[in-house]
Swiss-Prot record:
Active site: D29 (proton acceptor), H175 (proton donor)
Activity regulation as described: Inhibited by CuCl(2) and ZnCl(2).
Name this protein carries in UniProt: Peptidoglycan-N-acetylglucosamine deacetylase BC_3618
Phylogenetic placement of the source organism: Bacteria, Bacillati, Bacillota, Bacilli, Bacillales
The keyword Membrane belongs to this UniProt entry's keyword annotation: no
Function summary: Catalyzes the deacetylation of N-acetylglucosamine (GlcNAc) residues in peptidoglycan. Also acts on soluble chitin substrates and N-acetylchitooligomers. Acts on cell wall peptidoglycan from the Gram-positive bacteria B.cereus and B.subtilis and the Gram-negative bacterium H.pylori. Not active on acetylated xylan.
Organism whose genome encodes this protein: Bacillus cereus (strain ATCC 14579 / DSM 31 / CCUG 7414 / JCM 2152 / NBRC 15305 / NCIMB 9373 / NCTC 2599 / NRRL B-3711)
Length: 213
């Protein structure tokens, strides 16, 4: 796997975009999910928050109406590959196809911005090269903003992790699909008002990237 110190200087991979604007980008991986994505959208609407959803192609095939809903409500989507293959245990050819099949599929919905997030955050030479040549900005997350919600650690654990570590320019990693995400939804209902009270505005990743120097 390639390391952050190798990837960051290329300008093609982003973990966060520090700035003075009190803005945070909340991202959701592994959806869309017919149970949890609508609940997430309801909360985002309630707090006038924009977000970015890194979707898996095969889940979009099952729930195409949710992509329309996400986009209609002013959020953005990114390619989280077609089948969620990990660079840690897949061949270069399979990884390349998974990214490019996802790209082809997501182009039906959105042409810009071209955002990609590799499953598990794993990036090897094949993933980096394929994403770069496909025109993607690869988006990971702030290392201090992974509350491991996918492991269902408890609502308060998720809330405390995100709120206590919040800094302007953060990219927060949450999940709206792949399993029982009721803890994530319950945590989001507390995270949004708390950070709003602290003066934060919730933006899409592409808006956050405008602050990148």
């Amino acid at each position: 796997m390639l390391l952050r110190k190798e990837l960051e200087p290329t300008g093609y991979v982003t973990w966060e975009v520090p700035n003075n604007e009190k803005i945070i980008a909340i991202t959701f991986d592994d959806g869309p999910d017919p149970t949890y994505t609508p609940q997430v959208l309801d909360l985002l609407r309630q707090y006038k928050a924009e977000a970015t959803f890194f979707m898996i192609g095969f889940r979009v095939q099952r729930n195409p109406y949710l992509v329309k809903q996400v986009l209609k409500e002013g959020h953005e989507i990114g390619n989280h590959t077609m089948n969620h293959l990990y660079a840690s245990n897949s061949s270069d050819e399979k990884l390349e196809n998974d990214i490019l099949d996802g790209k082809k599929f997501f182009e039906k919905w959105v042409k810009e911005p071209l955002l990609f997030r590799p499953p598990g955050g794993y990036i090897n030479d094949a993933v980096f090269k394929t994403a770069k040549e496909a025109g993607y900005q690869t988006v990971l997350w702030s290392w201090h903003q992974d509350p491991r919600d996918w492991a269902n650690p408890g609502v308060e654990s998720i809330v405390n992790h995100v709120v206590k570590n919040a800094k302007s320019g953060d990219i927060v990693l949450l999940h709206d699909g792949g399993n029982d995400r009721s803890q994530t939804v319950a945590a989001l209902a507390k995270i949004l008002p708390e950070l709003k009270k602290q003066g934060y505005r919730f933006v899409t990743v592409s808006e956050l990237l405008r602050y990148k120097h």
